[in-house]
Amino acid sequence: MKVLITGTTQGIGKAIAMRFLDEGHQVIGIDRQRAGIVHEGYAHYVCDVRDKDNLPQIEDVEILINNAGTQNEDDIDINLKALIGITEKYAIQPHIRSVLNIGSASAHTGSEFPEYCASKGGVLAYTKNVAMRIAGYGATCNSLDPGGVLTPLNACVINDPELWAEIMEET
């Protein structure tokens, strides 16, 4: 299958890409950083997911995994608006089989930073919208909403023992 994943240079996105490659799928990554994966089944585009006008032309995506995300002043633009732009460009078409949006437990709990929670809550609502729209293609759209994940993005909360304990308690 042709799998498109955003945010593939590290953390969750890189792990997902490697698993699909190990299973023999064709994987295409989009990230602001250079490729962190070297594999014959992997193609990588360096671009900012927020820049809808300069997204690469990729036809017939079968699986889309929206993983690119952040926890800073760009939460709404990257976590929500860019995810919508990517999905509208690549998933709303007859070849799609599955869309997976990497959300956050914060979409359900409201904990952590206000803009981050709002962005991930928006992802949850948009996931439901897309699920209804692509069902006619026989496709599904789901959101995976993990709690605290040990990635560089979460360093600001991991390094705060009190905040990290709160997150672990809620998730």
Which residues make up each language-model segment?
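Conserved glycine-rich Rossmann-like NAD(P)H-binding loop of the short-chain dehydrogenase/reductase
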Residues: 23-37
